[in-house]
């Protein structure tokens, strides 16, 4: 069993039940999924860079990434229907816990001048969004094999009913939030 999954079962669940006085065990907040997405921008024109980006995200996530295509044409953005516009991967169950463990204990501490994640990333429904400026902080990524550095958006979806519950859940998982507020 994964380290964070054990932590959730043994100490996080009881702490959340105690703090929020939850009577029904089905209402205890838990992680649902983690979505990693990248907008490809100008890189969509170069198939080699696009494939390299998809391979990098697959390495980071430990699961095959999917290239997403535009659903309709938008002249203002010079995008036509069917053009690649992004790359995403959705992690659930064990892969989700493995990625979160790697993110919290390895990747985020490697970020230069890291002061913690912003507390403003909650959406009001118990989900948390944040962005990373580059992919080089992950141990699987080799600098020599990267054709173009890119950032990524990470969405952590929880079953929490409020941002307060979601914040406490993520804090107990060890997600480093910035001090203040």
Swiss-Prot record:
Key word Ribosomal protein present: yes
Membrane-spanning regions, if any?
A: none
GO MF annotation terms = rRNA binding; structural constituent of ribosome; tRNA binding
Q: What GO terms fall under cellular component here?
A: ribonucleoprotein complex; ribosome
User: Which SUPFAM superfamilies does UniProt cross-reference here?
Assistant: RL5-like
Query: Which one GO biological process term can you cite for this protein?
Result: translation
Q: Which UniProt keywords apply?
A: Ribonucleoprotein, Ribosomal protein, RNA-binding, rRNA-binding, tRNA-binding
Pfam families per the UniProt record, alphabetical = Ribosomal_L5, Ribosomal_L5_C
Q: Which InterPro entries does the record cross-reference, listed alphabetically?
A: Ribosomal_uL5, Ribosomal_uL5_bac-type, Ribosomal_uL5_C, Ribosomal_uL5_CS, Ribosomal_uL5_dom_sf, Ribosomal_uL5_N
Q: What's this protein's family per the entry?
A: Belongs to the universal ribosomal protein uL5 family.
Q: How does it assemble?
A: Part of the 50S ribosomal subunit; part of the 5S rRNA/L5/L18/L25 subcomplex. Contacts the 5S rRNA and the P site tRNA. Forms a bridge to the 30S subunit in the 70S ribosome.
Q: What does this protein do?
A: This is one of the proteins that bind and probably mediate the attachment of the 5S RNA into the large ribosomal subunit, where it forms part of the central protuberance. In the 70S ribosome it contacts protein S13 of the 30S subunit (bridge B1b), connecting the 2 subunits; this bridge is implicated in subunit movement. Contacts the P site tRNA; the 5S rRNA and some of its associated proteins might help stabilize positioning of ribosome-bound tRNAs.
Q: What is this protein called?
A: Large ribosomal subunit protein uL5
